[in-house]
Regions:
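Active-site helix-to-loop segments that bind/position phosphate- or nucleotide-bearing substrates
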Residues: 1-151
């Protein structure tokens, strides 16, 4: 079961951390595409909340974020020594954050074939490509938004 604010187990602690990393990447991509990260459709608009970035995050949760987190645990790259525990929360310690950040960096450098463009791109550029396509839709240059669907 998903728990957050605070995460109550190791998997939720890493999911929250990776979702935050991906959200920041999406925010930067949206700003590069001259889109306001706060002006979303799916997530409630609140001051300081990057609603549009959170909207786009939904496309990336399973294929990028969740897959990376499960891989870290399945390959035993994270152990109980990578976490701090108290009665209310489980948090990554410095060693755990370093492990996740290294895996995140490595993952972003891998290449995939973008399902819509049919071109090889680095995983780290997917948010930028999607933000640019969303901007093209909003400008009327593209008829509909092609979501990132990776098999």
């Amino acid at each position: 079961e998903r728990s957050r604010r605070p995460p109550r187990n190791e998997i939720n602690a890493v999911l929250s951390f990776v979702y935050t990393l991906q959200t920041r990447d999406i925010q930067a991509a949206l700003e590069t595409a001259n889109l306001d990260p706060a002006a979303g459709w799916l997530h409630t608009l609140r001051p300081g909340r990057p609603s549009l970035a959170l909207d786009l995050l939904e496309e990336f949760r399973a294929p990028l974020c969740d897959r990376l987190v499960l891989s870290l645990f399945n390959k035993h790259q994270l152990t109980d020594k990578d976490f701090e525990y108290d009665s209310l929360a489980v948090m990554l310690n410095e060693r755990g954050r370093k492990t996740v950040l290294t895996a995140w960096r490595d993952r972003k450098q891998e290449e995939i074939t973008h399902p819509y463009l049919g071109e090889k791109i680095q995983v780290g550029l997917i948010a930028y490509v999607q933000a640019m396509m969303l901007a093209r839709v909003l400008r009327g240059d593209l008829d509909c938004y092609p979501p990132f669907v990776w098999r």
